[in-house]
Amino acid sequence: MKQLTILGSTGSIGCSTLDVVRHNPDSFRVIALVAGKNVARMAEQCLEFSPRYAVMDDTSSAEQLKIMLQQHGSRTEVLSGQQAACEMAALDEVGHVMAAIVGAAGLLPTLAAIRAGKTILLANKESLVTCGRLFMDEVKRSNARLLPVDSEHNAIFQSLPQSIQHNLGYADLEQNGVTSILLTGSGGPFRETPMCDLAAMTPDQACRHPNWSMGRKVSVDSATMMNKGLEYIEARWLFNASARQMEVLIHPQSVIHSMVRYQDGSVLAQLGEPDMRTPIAHTMAWPNRVTSGAQPLDFCKLSALTFSAPDYQRYPCLKLAMEAFEQGQAATTALNAANEITVAAFLAQQIRFTDIAGLNLAVLERMDLQEPASVEDVLQVDAIAREVARKQVIRLSR
């Protein structure tokens, strides 16, 4: 039986992870749950899965949770704060850590899991976007293992030869017969919206993804295709891919989750219903397979599968992310931090949808982008970029 810590248990990925556990009670046991401030959902999870530990972001939320659990006779030990989250990621009895805390808050707990030599089920984009080389070096040093949870990276992983799967981030694609990686994305809810109408799009409209069920921040990132830009950066690190070995395609149906092109002309793809429980179950059970709870793909009900190249005028955030990778980790860190602030401002209706990309670019142009040599350096770049972004938002929304 595999023993789990779930970082970000009350979020979308965390809830889906627990659903896979629910479908496979003899295969997985939850040792620790870590979340932000959603006390009600955490209480439900603790009462159902009886973890040994539960960690909340702050002491107030932890106290509320403790009272609720005591009322139900739960023996789960309640803790709070980032240090406790890091300790849960490194518990001796835990072998697998689901890293699903959204944003820079997930960096240190994920790093703690890596340094403890765990198998990390990586759903936190920021880990590689901001700390790609640092994290990949730490993985090698600690003999940890990264298994990508993002549907696209998981699809690529499944389509790659075992020689690359067992040497992620360091294997030479060309030496293993791989020509390129094809990263697919739906194009989001505004793929066919006239360009002149994009400025008027509301947060609710941006969060109506045509295929996937996601949180609001990730939904906006899908609408701008910043999500795909961050995935591009991740893929470069995960698969040791050069720019010429990467292709990005718009695939509106979200049936083919990504592909790998081989030197002999073959293209291997992973297909499935757009349900995050599939890649989650794959990483949890790898190299075996378990039931995920997802519906099987019905080929007879499929319409045409279509593909097109992304329009960078429609999706400037995608281009921005691709260019940031070439500038280095300070640039990708600053871009990610700026984007978190600008998306939050859009969701709060402080700025327009079309302001997001321009503000992100403005932050990059105003930053002194010196390469970080440690996670502490990364966090400093992150903090400075956030402050610059906040000032830009205030200036624009006056």
From Swiss-Prot:
EC number of this enzyme: 1.1.1.267
SUPFAM superfamilies: 1-deoxy-D-xylulose-5-phosphate reductoisomerase, C-terminal domain (SSF69055), Glyceraldehyde-3-phosphate dehydrogenase-like, C-terminal domain (SSF55347), NAD(P)-binding Rossmann-fold domains (SSF51735)
Cofactor: Mg(2+); Mn(2+)
Residues given in the record as Mn(2+) binding sites: D150, E152, E231
Entry-linked InterPro entries: DXP_reductoisomerase, DXP_reductoisomerase_C, DXP_reductoisomerase_N, DXPR_C, DXPR_C_sf, NAD(P)-bd_dom_sf
Pathway connected to this protein: Isoprenoid biosynthesis; isopentenyl diphosphate biosynthesis via DXP pathway; isopentenyl diphosphate from 1-deoxy-D-xylulose 5-phosphate: step 1/6
Disulfide-bond pairs as recorded: none
Summary of subunit composition and partner proteins: Homodimer.
Protein's UniProt name: 1-deoxy-D-xylulose 5-phosphate reductoisomerase
Organism listed in the record: Salmonella choleraesuis (strain SC-B67)
